[in-house]
């Protein structure tokens, strides 16, 4: 099947949102909010391509007066071009958040990138991206920031503190649009050019250029995302993803090249995928050469959790109903799997990861805050990440912070950065960050104003 062929195929009894959006914008006849399809020569494609004018709003099902007309490129699937990319930034949460907000679980820093935005064509059943109701996510269109690499390069030139470039925590970096626009590649090249490490997170094939760039810095690494060992379930959960056999072969190939491989087993959909199946997945990953696994049980905002449940029941029948029976806990405003089930599972899974030579960590996994008697004090959530992690950092690979004094110099690792990163650094060193930099010790949600300040080591 081609990169986009699955969008016209049946993936179950439910109406996959990715397919719904694709079929809406590709319908041949004009209608309200869709002009007729026409052929136009395009310099980026270097040929004539199918385009049409569409009227979109920044919330799903926006009224006509709240829509604007944009040109939509229909190949290889509907997308629009935007001039200004989302700025580079760190994690969305810092160490010292409000007590009403779930605490940040990420041990170390990363620089978030967004080479492509909006809708994602991998079409994962559980994905929060395609279920979004606001912004470009709600339009059902992909967004492509033009000259993304140049925009990233200009921002990096202003930065004096840095971390690994995360490409990307949103849509997949290697989707078919990458072959046309090269935004992920140009972004990665800019990070490498200034001496910063990178990591990619993907459910699609790693291109050769990505593997080559990962070899440029010993702190760079590859991440892939997979949450079942059953090929049929995988097709239903992530219909646009690489096959499991191809994924394992790709892991072998990167492992032989000496690339560190971290796997996000994320999200585990309890009831549909059993712990026994996750252990079998660990066995296949270890045999292929993976180094680290990160587990997370599925969660969803309450506004769309019922839709997810309905979708799972339609796709998986009785197993979907079992999932519904476990998908019962409210923690930090998110609906997730029963706490007792999750904690018992993490204990089991971490044991088997260690048995197989894999390090283990969790991602955004919480439990209720309780007193010594077990009474619940708060349902906001307390991170369980440190309890179950067998690696120094939750992403597995030890990646320090980076700094430089001026734009004409390369970034260099902070020598006394602790293996575990910034989040616990000061708390475990008598309240003082080991590098001596106050801002690093606060582990804030880094914005560009923060990234412009060099790390002042003492």
Task: Indicate residue ranges for each PLM-predicted region.
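Auxiliary Fe-S-binding modules of radical SAM enzymes
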Residues: 2-64, 68, 279-458
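Short secondary-structure boundary segments
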Residues: 34, 38-82, 161-169, 173, ...
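Conserved Radical SAM active-site core
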Residues: 69-223, 231-232, 253, 439-458
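Conserved AdoMet/S-adenosylmethionine-binding subsite of the radical SAM
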Residues: 147-337
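Short coil/turn linker and secondary-structure boundary residues
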Residues: 13, 29-32, 49, 143, ...
């Amino acid at each position: 099947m081609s990169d986009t062929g699955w969008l016209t195929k049946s993936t179950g009894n439910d109406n996959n949102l990715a397919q719904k959006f694709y079929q809406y914008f590709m319908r041949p006849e004009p209608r309200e909010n869709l002009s007729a399809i026409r052929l136009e020569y395009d310099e980026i494609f270097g040929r004539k391509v199918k385009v049409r004018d569409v009227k979109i709003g920044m919330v799903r099902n926006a009224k006509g007066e709240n829509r604007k007309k944009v040109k939509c490129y229909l190949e290889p699937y509907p997308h629009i071009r935007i001039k200004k990319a989302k700025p580079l930034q760190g994690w969305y949460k810092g160490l010292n958040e409000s007590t009403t907000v779930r605490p940040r679980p990420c041990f170390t820093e990363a620089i978030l990138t967004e080479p492509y935005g909006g809708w994602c064509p991998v079409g994962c059943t559980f994905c929060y991206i395609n279920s979004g109701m606001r912004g470009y996510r709600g339009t059902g269109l992909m967004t492509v920031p033009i000259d993304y690499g140049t925009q990233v390069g200009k921002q990096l030139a202003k930065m004096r503190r840095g971390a690994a470039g995360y490409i990307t925590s949103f849509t997949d970096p290697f989707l078919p649009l990458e072959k046309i626009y090269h935004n992920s590649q140009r972004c990665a090249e800019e990070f490498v050019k200034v001496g910063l490490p990178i990591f990619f997170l993907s459910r699609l094939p790693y291109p050769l250029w990505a593997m080559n760039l990962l070899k440029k810095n010993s702190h760079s690494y590859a991440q892939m995302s997979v949450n079942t060992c059953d090929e049929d379930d995988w097709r239903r959960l992530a219909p646009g993803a690489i096959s499991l056999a191809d994924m394992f072969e790709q892991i072998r190939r990167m492992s032989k090249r000496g690339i560190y491989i971290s796997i996000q087993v994320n999200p585990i959909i309890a009831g549909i995928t059993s712990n026994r199946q996750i252990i079998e997945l660990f066995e296949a990953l270890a045999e292929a050469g993976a180094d680290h696994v990160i587990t997370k049980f599925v969660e969803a905002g309450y506004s769309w959790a019922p839709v997810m449940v309905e979708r799972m029941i339609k796709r998986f029948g009785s197993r979907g109903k079992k999932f519904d029976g476990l998908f019962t806990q409210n923690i930090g405003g998110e609906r997730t799997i029963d706490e007792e089930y999750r904690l018992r599972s993490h204990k089991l899974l971490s044991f088997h990861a260690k048995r197989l030579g894999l390090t283990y960590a969790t991602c955004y996994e919480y439990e209720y805050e309780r007193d010594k008697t077990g009474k619940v004090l708060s349902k906001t959530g307390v991170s369980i990440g440190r309890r179950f992690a067998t690696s120094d950092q939750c992403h597995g690979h030890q990646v320090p912070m980076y700094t430089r004094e001026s734009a004409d110099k390369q970034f260099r690792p902070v020598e006394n950065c602790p293996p575990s990163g910034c989040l616990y650094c000061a708390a475990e060193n008598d309240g003082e960050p080991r590098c001596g930099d106050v801002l690093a010790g606060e582990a804030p949600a880094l914005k560009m104003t923060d990234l412009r300040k060099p790390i002042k080591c003492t």
